[in-house]
Design a protein with these regions (language model features):
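N-terminal catalytic scaffold of extracellular/periplasmic and nuclease hydrolases
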Residues: 1-158
Length: 159
């Protein structure tokens, strides 16, 4: 949301008090990537999740491929429950920016493994195929990794 959206909200509300007026802190950020004025979702997600710019295609890492800590990690350290709830796959760039650290956004198996190794409280979304043994280069079922870490894996909407 940009400043023009906030201005439109103020007009719509007849200049009454809005949530923006009640907020203790607000920020204006730019999410263009470190290597391009036109960002992709991996770089934009990383900027939002970690407070750092990175290159297009990079996920949860700085331009030199060093892992960038996310606000999700801050919340986990503070003992807060955390989660990722998406209509895309959980391994997609935007949700992945909050828990994964890979130099290339399409490293879906590595992202899936990092999801399984994360301390998220809940993760809802697609991407089961990246955890199935038949789809993995190592042949190891990632679903078992998720279950071993205490995740309850649901594969049917009736569950």
């Amino acid at each position: 949301m940009g400043l023009s959206h906030v201005s439109m909200l103020m007009l719509e509300e007849g200049y009454g008090t809005t949530a923006f007026d009640r907020a203790q802190n607000i920020a204006l950020i730019t999410t263009y990537s470190a290597n391009n004025r036109v960002t992709d979702s991996a770089a934009a997600g990383t900027a939002l999740a970690t407070r750092h710019k990175t290159g297009n295609g990079m996920l949860g890492v700085l331009p030199d491929s060093t892992a960038a800590e996310s606000i999700m990690a801050d919340a986990i350290r503070a003992g807060m429950p955390t989660g990722v709830v998406v209509t895309s796959t959980l391994q997609h760039a935007t949700p992945g920016a909050f828990y994964a650290h890979v130099p290339y956004r399409r490293q879906y198996q590595r992202i899936s493994d990092q999801l399984a190794g994360s301390d998220l409280t809940v993760a809802f979304g697609g991407g089961l195929k990246y955890a199935e043994a038949s789809e993995r280069e190592d042949g190891v079922p990632g679903i078992e990794r998720l279950r071993d870490r205490g995740f309850r894996v649901l594969t049917d909407p009736s569950q």
